[in-house]
Every structure is written in structure tokens, then in C-alpha cells.
Swiss-Prot record:
InterPro entries the record matches: Deoxyribose1P_isomerase_DrdI (IPR043679), IF-2B-related (IPR000649), IF-M1Pi (IPR005251), IF_2B-like_C (IPR042529), Initiation_fac_2B_a/b/d (IPR011559), M1Pi_N (IPR027363), NagB/RpiA_transferase-like (IPR037171)
Family of this protein: Belongs to the EIF-2B alpha/beta/delta subunits family. DrdI subfamily.
Catalytic activity reported: 5-deoxy-alpha-D-ribose 1-phosphate = 5-deoxy-D-ribulose 1-phosphate
Gene Ontology molecular function terms on file: S-methyl-5-thioribose-1-phosphate isomerase activity
PANTHER family, A to Z: METHYLTHIORIBOSE-1-PHOSPHATE ISOMERASE
Task of the protein: Catalyzes the isomerization of 5-deoxy-alpha-D-ribose 1-phosphate to 5-deoxy-D-ribulose 1-phosphate, as part of a 5-deoxyribose salvage pathway that recycles this toxic radical SAM enzyme by-product to mainstream metabolites.
Catalytic center residues: D240 (proton donor)
Transmembrane spans: none
Top-level division of the source organism's lineage: Bacteria
Name the UniProt record assigns to this protein: 5-deoxyribose 1-phosphate isomerase
Keywords attached to this entry: Carbohydrate metabolism, Isomerase
Pathway assigned in UniProt: Carbohydrate degradation
Gene name in the database record: drdI
Species this chain originates from: Clostridium botulinum (strain Hall / ATCC 3502 / NCTC 13319 / Type A)
Site (Transition state stabilizer): C160
């Protein structure tokens, strides 16, 4: 079984290589990119998806923009860079890692404003690679922290894809699953199908199956049943943005899963790289929620599944109230309620 990586970097050819996640699980194909415009399209069209992976991809996209930026003086170079940063940031408004990575790249350019512009371009190349490598380490550490909350024989429910395909490697929510397999644990994963784009069945189930992990796909409306049957000991999901009070935006349907978990007394864990925590966003009400193409709901695989012309509401995300969350697990440690106080402490370390 082959290891599936969402993001690859070809250092010799200066190209970003992305797994086309829109055609999984039927085809495994990679697409090469070397322009900011191409990277924008890859994020907008969900060739690449998942907040950490989007952030890494955007960093490379801004480097590609820097490559063709004016070189006469820093002011002109940085003006162009800022314009392209705003352009890339508009591709997916909910994932905070996107704006975080772009700000890191902008700051790196400003730190080196007294250097030759050609040298700054090389520095930005290395910074994008550093963000990529850091994401791998973050994901592994999140897994190491999460696995301390689990035990051999555990039954896990996950929603959408916060796996290796949503990050540079390991995933966030799936990281403890890969580590548990390495330890030889006997455990079972239930993967919500995740309507309407089916990331749970086409992505999470695929990557776990390819890794030899015991995974079972269920439709979203089966989650209550498997919980009631005692098959689930923990719910682990990723996130796209966490507000200062712990409210968490994640793929549509996550809030419903959290309500079920609370009802059945099952712990709900959020796997979260610290770049996904937005201390400047006070509550979930302040998180922008992307609305997507209605045809994601009304048609699938070229077949209409609803009357043509029917009204459709298709938010890509919902917000899980902090009251429903047992713990937020980051690379810096496990955060328990009260989240408003304890999340802030992460950034004081």
C-alpha cells in the first residue's frame, strides 16, 4: 500500500506538486504548480484542502509571486507581494492557516528589507520550505499528545478529513491513529462520509485503508447509532479556525457530531496546530463561513439528486460550541476548559 502525500516540493525544479484530491479515490494523480495563480486555483477548487495543507500551499504560492515581482527597489517588490498575498488569501476565507502562512512570509520579507531583492526572493523560498517542514513536526507532536488520551482497543469516530491528506504528513486528527498503528495497538476507526463533498469516505477512509488501519465508513446520519451501540470511545476531529473562547469552525456536520458526543458522554477532542487558533477572533460568531456551490448538494457524479432549480443552502463549515469540546490538543500541549484563559496561555510560553 502506497503512502499518499498531499504536498510535495521538487527542490531541483522549483515546483510544488499537489495530489489532486477532487478525483480521489478513483484516481491518484499529482499536478505541478509554479505560479501564484495556479496555487490560487488549487486552493479555490479544492485540489488541495485542509487548513494546514492550504497554509503550506499558500506559502509556496507567495514565493512563486515573489519570483516574478519587481526587483528595482524593495518598496515596489513588497507592494506587489502584498497584492498577491491578498489575492491568495481570498481563495478560502475560513481557514486561518491560510492568512497565517501569508503573514509569516510577508514578515520574513520585511525583516530582510535592507537586503538585495534577489536575495529576499531566495529567503522566501527557504521560508516556504521551513513552513512545510514545521507542519510535519507539528502534526507528529499533536499525535503524540493525543495518544496519551487513548488506549489500546479504542473506537474512534472522525468527521471529514483532518488526515495526512489535509496536512504535509501524519494529519492532525489522524496522527494518533498512525502512531497507534506503529505501536501495534488494536483499534477501530469510524469515518463519517461527510456530505456533501464526501471527504470522509473519499479521503479519510482512503488514506487509513492504504495505511492498513482498520477503518469503517458510515454515513453522517449513522453516527448516533454507532455511538448508542458503544462502539465509540472518543471523537477526534480537526479544525479550520478556533476562536479565543474555544468555539471551533470545522467541516459542516462537526457541530452535530459534538452534540451527539455530549449526549452519549463521549469525549470530543479537537486536533489543532496553534496556527489554527485565532486569538483575535473572540467567538465563533466572528468566524466567516464560506458558502459553496449549490451543485455540491444537488448533484453528484454527473447525476442530479434534487430538482433542478430548487433552493440550496450550502455552508462549508459550522461552529462547534466550546461547551461541547473536552479538550483542544495542540503541538504545545493539551488545553482543557476554560478555553478563554487556557488558550491564551499557549501563546505566552
Amino acid at each position: 500500500m502506497a503512502e499518499l502525500l498531499a504536498i510535495k516540493w521538487d527542490d531541483n525544479r522549483d515546483k510544488l506538486i499537489l495530489l489532486d484530491q477532487t478525483i480521489l479515490p478513483n484516481k491518484i494523480e499529482y499536478i505541478e504548480y509554479d505560479t501564484a495563480e495556479g496555487v490560487y486555483d488549487s486552493i479555490k477548487d479544492m485540489i488541495v484542502r485542509g487548513a494546514p495543507a492550504i497554509g503550506v500551499t499558500a506559502a509556496y504560492g507567495l514565493y512563486f509571486a515573489a519570483k516574478v515581482a519587481p526587483e528595482d527597489k524593495f518598496e515596489n517588490f513588497f507592494k506587489y507581494l502584498k497584492e498577491k498575498s491578498s489575492y491568495l488569501d481570498s481563495s478560502r476565507p475560513t481557514a486561518v492557516n491560510l492568512s497565517w502562512a501569508l503573514k509569516v512570509m510577508e514578515s520574513k520579507a520585511l525583516e530582510n528589507k535592507d537586503k538585495d531583492v534577489k536575495e529576499i526572493k531566495s529567503i522566501l523560498r527557504e521560508e516556504a520550505k521551513r513552513i512545510h517542514e514545521e507542519d510535519i513536526e507539528i502534526c507528529k507532536t499533536i499525535g503524540e499528545n493525543l495518544i496519551t488520551l487513548l488506549k489500546d482497543g479504542v473506537g474512534i469516530l472522525t468527521h471529514c478529513n483532518a488526515g495526512q491528506l489535509a496536512t504535509s504528513k501524519y494529519g492532525t486528527a489522524t496522527s494518533p491513529m498512525y502512531l497507534a498503528k506503529e505501536k501495534g495497538w488494536n483499534f477501530k476507526v469510524y469515518s463519517d462520509e461527510t456530505r456533501p463533498r464526501l471527504q470522509g469516505s473519499t479521503l479519510t477512509a482512503l488514506e487509513l485503508y492504504e495505511a492498513g488501519i482498520d477503518v469503517t465508513t458510515i454515513t453522517d446520519n449513522m453516527a448516533a447509532m454507532v455511538m448508542s451501540q458503544g462502539k465509540i470511545d472518543a471523537v477526534i476531529v480537526g479544525c479550520d479556525r478556533i476562536a479565543a473562547n474555544g468555539d471551533t469552525a470545522n467541516k459542516i456536520g462537526t457541530m452535530g457530531v459534538s452534540i451527539l458526543a455530549k449526549y452519549f458522554g463521549i469525549p470530543m477532542y479537537i486536533a489543532a496546530p496553534t496556527p489554527s487558533i485565532d486569538i483575535n477572533t473572540k467567538t465563533g460568531e466572528d468566524i466567516p463561513i464560506e458558502e459553496r456551490n449549490p451543485e455540491e448538494v444537488t448533484s453528484r457524479f454527473g447525476v442530479w439528486t434534487a430538482p433542478k432549480g430548487v433552493k440550496v443552502y450550502n455552508p462549508g463549515f459550522d461552529v462547534t460550541p466550546h461547551e461541547n469540546i473536552t479538550a483542544i490538543v495542540t503541538e504545545k500541549g493539551i488545553v482543557y476548559p476554560p478555553f478563554k484563559e487556557n488558550l491564551k496561555k499557549l501563546f505566552e510560553k
